[in-house]
Amino acid sequence: MMTWAPDRSEDINAVKMAGVPAMAQTYARWVNDTGGIDGRELRVIVCDEGDTSIGAERCAREAVDKKVAAVVGSYSRHGQSFMPALEAGGVPYIGGYGASTEEFSSYLSYPVNGGQSALLAGHGRQLGGSCTRVSLVRPDSIGGDGMPPLLNNGLLAANRPASTDILAPLDATSYDEQAAQALERSGGGCVTAVLGARTETFFDSFRRLEPDGEQVRISSVLGSVSQPLINRTGGRNSPFEGAYVTGWYPDAKNARWQQMRDVIEKYAFGDNRIDPDDTTVQTTWIAYTALRAAVRAIGDENVTPGRVVATLNGGVEVDTGGLTPTLRWRFKDLVGTLSYPRIVNTKVTFQVVREGRLTAQRKGFVDVADALTDAPRS
């Protein structure tokens, strides 16, 4: 198997997800120490894709050349580069983080979550419960253009007005102008920002402009806000205290993550790259859980890319211990919309930052399939 992610880069704007390959290697140590997958050794090759399209394609070509059975639990924003190479080699892509739109359209991709689209659709539903008006601050880009319709579907379902759309550059060092617009147009309601790594910068600007004693509810989605970010920016004193956040999985303190935490404690050997609160690490754990189910279903035959694909397409069920709904990728399990044909998991979770921790705002999962199928293509 192969797992890739951006690990080391001299580009200060590049994302770094060193915990992803580290989690994959930790999972393999655990599996192999406990008898393998029905006696088979799990071998993991890691690749640093450097957060570049060239690096992503290089990793994909290496996966094909080394005849790996699957690429599992990886992170890359460059699906337009890696997916064609995997398709040419017939190698499946299992449980990618969801940072590339191609992960939700390629016939060889088997996503374990609904990507940012599901988060936005769910976030509209979450905000619709308590926000009379919403300002959405999002990237001034083609990808950003698809955000308002998804968010608005959830708001409109709660009989709330559509959000106010505020565009922001992704290379800014300050967002005072956008923060002022968001504050003015929120009407005392809610301000949500989905700016990836720049979300922190926006809310720094926003909190400085807020009138004393008048705290507007802020919100975002996982990927733009995370527990490691909250910890790094002050915990309970961070600008995210009180924020609504929509995620894919149960909050990090949920007991369903205990097995993963135990494995990290025993087999990561103190590797500080692995943060069990990090959604990228959690997604890699779930992806390898899916791989394990597929390999077990193959039985005594050789594990090849073709057999992994046939097993997944044939309807093998993946029980993630309640971290997601049961996952299957038969044709009838797919959402099948034009924009997101490969999504099978349309469930999200509603969380809120309390005392510096992401905690469940509402128990269980919320299904946003209807909001995804109603959204226009972005």
Tell me what each language-model feature is:
Residues 13-37, 153-154:
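Short, polar/charged alpha-helical segment
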Residues 1-25, 49-53, 140-145, 276-282:
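Extracytoplasmic "Venus flytrap"
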Residues 15-19, 35-103, 112, 169-173, ...:
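Beta-alpha junction/loop-to-helix N-cap segments that form part of ligand/metal-binding clefts
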Residues 206-286, 368:
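Extracellular/periplasmic periplasmic-binding protein-like sensory domains
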Residues 68-168, 214-241:
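Extracytoplasmic ligand/sensor domains, especially the bilobed periplasmic-binding protein
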Residues 271-281, 292-358:
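Segments of small-molecule ligand-sensing domains
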Residues 77-84, 189-210, 287:
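Hydrophobic alpha-helical
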Residues 1-5, 42-46, 133-135:
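Short, well-ordered beta-strand elements
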